[in-house]
Structures are given as structure tokens and as C-alpha cells.
């Protein structure tokens, strides 16, 4: 019995040893489970990436809106262009598989083509621009800009030089004109004094001669003034006008004396009797 008892603990110890050996073997199994989870997570992410290109592959059964609009305008052959309603009706009859938002998309594309100058809008209709009309306005626009830029500085320089010359010439001509008038007045006074003792008829003739003499030098100076500037001739004309008015006033009192008027009335009364 003692021998058996001694053998029992040995077996127990061996079992305990076995249990201690088995326990560390479970840990790598747990690590292996985690690796499986990571692989499954990676597998689920891959189909998401594959779904994105499937959306890009969707193709429309009809051509682009630009092609459809131009085809409608060409086939309709309207002189003043095709309206939006006519283009819409033509496309709907020709292409049956259109999206439900076709009318809105058509309007948006029409506005876009007009903005990009691929179509021309006339009132409420649309036309394809001709090759001549599209080519001619582009080179014409820069030529006009260059002409205006070159013409502006020349016009300003000419305008600045012209008034400067006109002012300088006006200042130079106004002063000698005043001197000439003063000289004419001085010459007229001594002649009037000499002829004071003579009868009235001679004095009138002398005054007219003095006016004629004073007017002659002014007449000679007028062409010189006219050659320099056009504004110089105007003061000469104004000075000559009062001389003529004075002569008219002197002749008027001589004509106002009418002696024959009472004689005519007497003759008419005699005829009535």
C-alpha cells in the first residue's frame, strides 16, 4: 500500500505538468483568430471600390445636346431660325429614349451655346452663325481700337495748339486797333477847326472828307487782319457802321421839310368844286 501511495502523486504531478504544457498552446490559436478578422475586413472593402466604376460606364442612348440642337435647326431650314418649341418637338420625335428632365436640360444647353457664340439668338428663335459673319467682326474690332488710340493724342495736341495761337494773335491785334482809332480822331479835329469859318455846305463836305480819309487807312488794315485770324475783321466792321449811320441822320432833316404837301391838298379841293 505504501508503494501505491507513492506512485499516485507521481501520476498527479504528471497530469499537472500536462495541464501546464497545454495552457500556452491556446494562445497562438487566439492570435490566429484575429488574423482571420482582418482578412475578412479587407475582403469587404474591395467590393466598394469595384462599385464606383460601374456608375461611370452608364452611357446615354441619345447623342449630345449640341448635336441634337444643330441637327434640328439644319433639318427644319427656317429662314428666321427655329424656336425652342420647334427644336424640342423635333428631338422628341426623333429620339424616344430621353430623360424626364429633357426640357430643362434643353433650355440650359441652348443658353450655353448662345453664350459660347455657337448659336445666334434672334428674338425667340435660334440660328447657326454663318462662317462669314463669325469671321468678319473679330478682325474688325481690334482695327477700330488702334485707330482711336492713335487719333486721340493728335486731336488733343492740335486742339491745345490752336487756342494758344488764337489767344496770342487776338492779344496782338486788339492793341493796334485801339491806336488806329485814336489817330483818326486826332486828325479829324484840326480839319474841323479850319473849316469852321466857311458856310455850312462846305463844312458838311469837309466832315464827309475827314470821315472818308479816316475810313481809308482802316480799309487798308482790314486785309492784314483777315489774313492772320478771322476774329480780327469783326472790330473793323463795327467801327465802320457808326460812320454810315451819322451820314443818314444828317440827310433825314433835309427830306423832312415838305413844302409841296399843302399845294396838293389845295389842288384837290379845287377839282371837287
Swiss-Prot record:
Q: Which residues form the H15 domain?
A: 61-130
Which Pfam families does the entry link to?
Linker_histone
In terms of one coarse class, where is the protein primarily found? nucleus
Q: Where is this region: Disordered?
A: 1-63, 193-273
Residue numbers bearing the N-acetylserine modification = 2
Using the UniProt entry, state the residues involved in the cross-link Glycyl lysine isopeptide (Lys-Gly) (interchain with G-Cter in ubiquitin), renumbered to this chain.
156, 165
SUPFAM superfamilies under this entry?
A: Winged helix' DNA-binding domain
Q: Cellular component terms, GO, for this chain's entry?
A: mitochondrion; nucleolus; nucleosome
Give the Gene Ontology MF terms in alphabetical order.
DNA binding; structural constituent of chromatin
Keyword Magnesium applies: no
**Which UniProt keywords are given for this protein, alphabetically ordered?**
Acetylation, Chromosome, DNA-binding, Isopeptide bond, Nucleus, Phosphoprotein, Ubl conjugation
* GO BP annotation list: nucleosome assembly
Residue(s) carrying Phosphoserine: 14
Q: Name the domain of life.
A: Eukaryota
* Compartments reported by the entry: Nucleus; Chromosome
Task: Establish whether keyword ATP-binding is in the entry.
Answer: no
Q: Where do Low complexity bias regions lie? A: 193-216, 237-256
Q: Where is the composition biased (Basic residues)?
A: 33-59, 257-273
The entry's family comment says: Belongs to the histone H1/H5 family.
**Function (record text):** Histones H1 are necessary for the condensation of nucleosome chains into higher-order structures.
Q: What is this protein called?
A: Histone H1.2
Amino acid at each position: 500500500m505504501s508503494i501505491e501511495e507513492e506512485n499516485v502523486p507521481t501520476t498527479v504531478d504528471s497530469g499537472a505538468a500536462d495541464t501546464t504544457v497545454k495552457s500556452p498552446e491556446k494562445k497562438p490559436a487566439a492570435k490566429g483568430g484575429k488574423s482571420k478578422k482582418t482578412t475578412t475586413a479587407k475582403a469587404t472593402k474591395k467590393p466598394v471600390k469595384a462599385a464606383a466604376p460601374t456608375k461611370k460606364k452608364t452611357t446615354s442612348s441619345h447623342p449630345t445636346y449640341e448635336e441634337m440642337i444643330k441637327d434640328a435647326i439644319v433639318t427644319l431650314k427656317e429662314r428666321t431660325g427655329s424656336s425652342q418649341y420647334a427644336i424640342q418637338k423635333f428631338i422628341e420625335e426623333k429620339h424616344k429614349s430621353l430623360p424626364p428632365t429633357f426640357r430643362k436640360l434643353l433650355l440650359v444647353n441652348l443658353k450655353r451655346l448662345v453664350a459660347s457664340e455657337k448659336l445666334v439668338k434672334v428674338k425667340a428663335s435660334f440660328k447657326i452663325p454663318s462662317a462669314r459673319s463669325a469671321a468678319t467682326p473679330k478682325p474688325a474690332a481690334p482695327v477700330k481700337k488702334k485707330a482711336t488710340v492713335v487719333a486721340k493724342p493728335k486731336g488733343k495736341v492740335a486742339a491745345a495748339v490752336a487756342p494758344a495761337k488764337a489767344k496770342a494773335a487776338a492779344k496782338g491785334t486788339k492793341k493796334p486797333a485801339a491806336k488806329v482809332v485814336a489817330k483818326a480822331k486826332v486828325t479829324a479835329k484840326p480839319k474841323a477847326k479850319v473849316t469852321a469859318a466857311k458856310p455850312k455846305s462846305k463844312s458838311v463836305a469837309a466832315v464827309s472828307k475827314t470821315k472818308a480819309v479816316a475810313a481809308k487807312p482802316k480799309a487798308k488794315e482790314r486785309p492784314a487782319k483777315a489774313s492772320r485770324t478771322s476774329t480780327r475783321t469783326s472790330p473793323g466792321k463795327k467801327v465802320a457802321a457808326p460812320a454810315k449811320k451819322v451820314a443818314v441822320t444828317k440827310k433825314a432833316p433835309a427830306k423832312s421839310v415838305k413844302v409841296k404837301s399843302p399845294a396838293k391838298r389845295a389842288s384837290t379841293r379845287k377839282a371837287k368844286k
